[in-house]
Amino acid sequence: MSKGILGKKLGMTGLFSSDGRHIPVTVIEAGPCVVTQIKTKDKDGYNALQLGFGPKKERHTNKPETGHFEKSGGAAYVMVKEFAVDNPEEFELGQSLSTELFAVGEKIDVAGVSKGRGFAGVMKRHGFGGGRMTHGGRCKRRPGSIGCSAWPSKVIKGKKLPGHYGVERKTVRNLEIVDIRADQNLILLKGAVPGAKSGMLELKKLKFGGK
């Protein structure tokens, strides 16, 4: 069995549990993902499946990509990722994988690219408290001192300062699957996942045991 699949974030909504609790959920289009390459320990040194998801326009596909995808049916994909697998011999090129890898109540890890927020200050980027909001104050949203002048006479590497915020790979662990709608290739996860609407995601089996 593959350790994960690819998906797309469609947005957030809410569900009510049997006891009347409101549960915020993220709706994810999980597959169908196509097996574009099978890697084995004998040939490649490790066992893995290369999965493709999301159709890619022909005019955006170069010749090496076209030749690679011809082996699995010819269609090109926007997102291509590898997932570890224990038994690669059970899969074949062009095979489709979807929500059947997961079950309701199971907890999974979700990885994606966070929303881009441009150039941000220290309060938004790092959660600084800021200065006193007094009349005439000049340090309301400033970071304060960033180092000493006499020694070491420089800003220490790694100092939290204003800068570009977002567009980073983030992983959220132990998200519970609330519902699976196999006929629509949808998975409803409890809570939020990284990225904006239509962002590509990796849905993976737990790397660490969840409670």
Curated annotation (Swiss-Prot):
Transmembrane segments: none annotated. InterPro entries: Ribosomal_uL3 (IPR000597), Ribosomal_uL3_bac/org-type (IPR019927), Ribosomal_uL3_CS (IPR019926), Transl_B-barrel_sf (IPR009000). The keyword Nucleus does not apply. GO terms for molecular function: rRNA binding; structural constituent of ribosome. Keywords: Ribonucleoprotein, Ribosomal protein, RNA-binding, rRNA-binding. One of its GO terms (biological process) is translation. SUPFAM superfamilies: Translation proteins. PROSITE patterns: RIBOSOMAL_L3. Gene3D superfamilies: 3.30.160.810, Translation factors. GO terms for cellular component: cytosolic large ribosomal subunit. Pfam families: Ribosomal_L3. The keyword Ligase does not apply. Belongs to the universal ribosomal protein uL3 family. HAMAP family: Ribosomal_uL3_B (MF_01325_B). One of the primary rRNA binding proteins, it binds directly near the 3'-end of the 23S rRNA, where it nucleates assembly of the 50S subunit. Part of the 50S ribosomal subunit. Forms a cluster with proteins L14 and L19. This is Large ribosomal subunit protein uL3. It comes from Desulfatibacillum aliphaticivorans.
